[in-house]
Structure formats: C-alpha cells, structure tokens
UniProtKB/Swiss-Prot annotation:
GO terms for cellular component: chromosome, telomeric region; cytoplasm; cytosol; nuclear matrix; nucleoplasm; nucleus; THO complex; THO complex part of transcription export complex. SUPFAM superfamilies: DEATH domain (SSF47986). Expression is altered specifically during apoptosis and is accompanied by the appearance of novel forms with smaller apparent molecular mass. This is THO complex subunit 1. It comes from Rattus norvegicus (Rat). The keyword NAD does not apply. Its main location: nucleus. One of its GO terms (biological process) is signal transduction. Component of the THO subcomplex, which is composed of THOC1, THOC2, THOC3, THOC5, THOC6 and THOC7. The THO subcomplex interacts with DDX39B to form the THO-DDX39B complex which multimerizes into a 28-subunit tetrameric assembly. Component of the transcription/export (TREX) complex at least composed of ALYREF/THOC4, DDX39B, SARNP/CIP29, CHTOP and the THO subcomplex; in the complex interacts with THOC2, THOC5 and THOC7. TREX seems to have a dynamic structure involving ATP-dependent remodeling. Binds to the hypophosphorylated form of RB1. Interacts with RNA polymerase II. Interacts with LUZP4. There is a cross-link at residues 86, 258, 273 (Glycyl lysine isopeptide (Lys-Gly) (interchain with G-Cter in SUMO2)).
C-alpha cells in the first residue's frame, strides 16, 4: 500500500514518536529505540510472528493500536484520503429459456439426436409456432356434432339408448366443446332439463338447424382425387420444392472446387462445432480437401434432412452469395432437364 512506501520518511517517524512512545508500540521489547525503525522496515512481519515477545492480550492491544495508527497515517500523509465503497449485492434473476439457447448464427439448437434436432428446429421461435393455425387441434363444430346430428334425424331411426349423447364421456366433452365454440351454451333459457342427455339433445337440434346440410360440406371421393392430382402437378412445377432435395456427390465436388479457402467462413453457418473445425484443419493442409470434408461433415450431421435449400441459405448468410447463386442455377438446370425427360 501507499503508506508502506512512505514509512521510512523522517516526517512519519517524528510523528510516531510524538503520537505514542516506543514502549507502547512494542511492549516488553526491552530493546533500543532503533527497534522501531527495524520493525517498520520489515512491515512488522518478524515482530508480529514472534510469540515469545508478545502475550495474547498485548498482541490484541498492539493490533488495535496499529490499526488506529494506520488510519491516522493515511489521513495525515496521503494526498487523497481513502474512500470506501459499499459492497453491492448481486441481484438474483430468474433464469429465462433464452439464457440457455444456443447463440449461433442461425440459432439452430443441436439436441443430440437427429430426429429431435429436426423437430425442435422446425420453427425458430417455439412460442410463435404454438400460435400457428396448424397447431389448432380442436375439431370444427360441424365435424364434432356430425354423428350426433345424424342420430337425431328421425329418418335414420336410431334408438335413444344407442345415441352418442347417452355416453357420459362424450357428454362431458360436448359440454366443454360447446363452452368454447357455441354461443348457445351461455344464452339463458326458460326450458328446464332433468339431466344432461335432454340438454344435449336440445342443443343438437338447434345446431342441426343452423349448420349447413351434410351433403354440402362433404366432398366426393372423385373431387378429392382430382385435388390430390392437381396438388402433385403444382408440386412438381414449384421451383422451391425442386430445391428441397438432398445434395448429390456431384454437387459437393462442384461446390468444393469453388469454395476452396472460404470453407472456414461457411463453417459456423453450417452449425459445425469448433472441435470438428479443428479436426478438419488437422485432416489435411489442402484447402479443397478441407472444404470437401466440411460439406461431408455437414451432410452427416443433418442426415436425411440435409437439402440444397438449407445449404443455399447458409451460403447467403455467410456472405458467399455468388456461390449460392451458382448452386441455385445448377439446381434449376438439373430440374429443367429432368422435367424434359418426363414430358
């Protein structure tokens, strides 16, 4: 500390002799006054660790006086007085899921299993994915009550004991579904029902009057087949779907020759780990071999889910847009040639 470097100063020694005597600083020492100078030179290390010279009480007194003396020296001889700051306690914060997510360029999480990794990364934001319409598993009102409406029709001649509304499990599911989908559930009524079956039968009759006829909403098998065929034709014509194909060995060879020394720029965007990158560097000094090894490692990591579209996206994100454009053109050319063969 600063006051130790100034201990040998004559002004401080004069101050010490005025403030307290030698006997008070070193009780029972029985030595000459130059002991004080020697003690200060060694920062009291020798004297404080000598148990023969001090008893416990004298030692505690010495420590107390020495601490007081240190404060006075600091306040009198230092240019700036010592300032003390309060210790700030760390604020406890609840861990959020985002704290554990991988901060990689495209935020892809590697679960450790190929299928789990694919399922987890179907959507970048899982909370937003839960709001998608495709995640809505509750059936449509018409589909849910289709069976009950058919059984309620007198022309079908279904006996009451065989109707679905008599099933207690179906009844409770129907009540929950009506509370979610139908406005009739919360409308007041003057009718009184003895049991749940009578209430559900009344609700089914109301819905049968409001919903469209069954023939209008159900399509024939021929119409469905025609729509499936049209969808297949559109799928074959779509360039986006054509790009969503596994990468062949020829494309890897072509991309390897173009990638060359830029393979290390692309590696982080293909979610290649640092340990794998170091292993690729040790594999060979040839840049083309390293680039090929990178693409092979990426194919092994993605498994059956590696596609040309994913590779093009990684190339664009890494700034290698010229290679991405070249790969896109090659893909479109191959798709065009295949279409000529089939037509």
């Amino acid at each position: 500390m600063e006051y130790y470097s100034a201990i040998k100063n004559n002004d401080i020694m004069k101050f010490l002799s005025k403030w307290m005597g030698v006997e008070e600083i070193i009780p029972k020492a029985g030595k000459e006054p130059d002991v004080l100078q020697q003690t200060m030179d060694t920062e009291n290390v020798v004297y404080l660790h000598n148990g023969l010279l001090l008893s416990y009480n004298d030692f505690m007194k010495f420590i107390g006086k020495w601490m007081e003396l240190e404060y006075i020296i600091l306040s009198e001889f230092c240019e700036e007085r010592a300032s003390y700051t309060k210790l700030k306690r760390g604020v406890w914060k609840r861990s959020a899921p985002e704290d554990f997510l991988d901060k990689r360029p495209n935020k892809k999480i590697l679960i450790g299993n190929e299928e789990l990794t694919r399922l987890w990364n179907l959507c970048p934001d899982n909370m937003e994915a839960c709001k998608l319409e495709t995640r809505e598993y509750m059936p449509i009102l018409e589909e849910f009550f289709e069976e009950a409406i058919e059984q309620a029709d007198a022309e079908n001649m279904v006996e009451s004991e065989y109707k679905a509304i008599n099933n207690s499990n179906y009844g409770w599911s129907t009540l929950r579904f009506l509370a979610w989908r139908s406005p009739h559930f919360f409308q007041p009524t003057n009718q009184q029902f003895k049991n749940m079956t009578e209430y559900l039968e009344n609700m089914v009759i109301k819905l049968a009057k409001e919903l469209p006829p069954h023939s209008e909403e159900i399509k024939t098998g021929e119409d469905e087949d025609e729509e499936d065929n049209d969808a297949l034709l559109k799928e074959n014509e779509s360039p986006d779907v054509r790009q969503d194909k596994p990468i062949t060995g020829e494309r890897i060879e072509s991309l390897t020759n173009k990638l060359d020394e830029q393979w290390k720029i692309l590696a982080p965007y293909l979610e290649i780990k640092d340990s794998d990158i170091r292993q690729i560097e040790c594999y060979s000094e040839d840049m083309k071999k390293r680039a090929k090894q990178l693409l092979v490692a990426w194919k092994d990591q993605e498994g059956v889910h590696e596609t040309t579209d994913n590779l093009i996206g990684a190339l664009n994100k890494s700034g290698l847009s010229d290679l991405a454009e070249s790969l896109t053109n090659d893909t479109e050319t191959n798709s065009y040639l295949l279409s000529l063969l089939f037509y």
